[in-house]
Amino acid sequence: MPSMDIVSEVDEVELRNAVENSVRELKSRFDFRGKEASIEYKDHVVTLSAEDDFQCQQLVDILRMQMSKRSVDPASMDVDEKALHSGKTFSLKVRFKEGIETLIAKKLVKMIKDSKLKVQSSIQGDSVRVTGKKRDDLQAVMALARESELGQPFQFNNFRD
């Protein structure tokens, strides 16, 4: 019986490349010349620092653009609501969603069951295992998960026939 896992994870190497490209773009941008701004990556958290709140939002846009160029889904970003002000700099922390939370996994399983496809889905930790009789059913589940608006990107692995 064909089966697959639906997971939500960020490629660490591509994320680091996107951050390094963002730093490179930050150094060459005209509107950041003479300003104190930085982008740092440490322990799966990106820290954006700038002299005012507007520039912090520009740094978020730069990071989003570089992530999409490196094929890392920007929907996995979890940006702080408000910039933290300390001294003369504002800083934002950007965290990345790893794994599927239980609530989102339950919604995904319910959506799969409501689609009337002949598959069984079960929650296994931070992933969802889907098994079915035909490969076509699993591909339909993949399309359904990609179209879903659950606020988190999904990847598919352990595809077994």
Curated annotation (Swiss-Prot):
GO terms for molecular function: nucleotide binding. InterPro entries: DUF520 (IPR007551), UPF0234-like_C (IPR035571), UPF0234_N (IPR035570), YajQ-like_sf (IPR036183). Transmembrane segments: none annotated. Nucleotide-binding protein. Belongs to the YajQ family. HAMAP family: YajQ (MF_00632). This is Nucleotide-binding protein Ssed_3443. It comes from Shewanella sediminis (strain HAW-EB3).
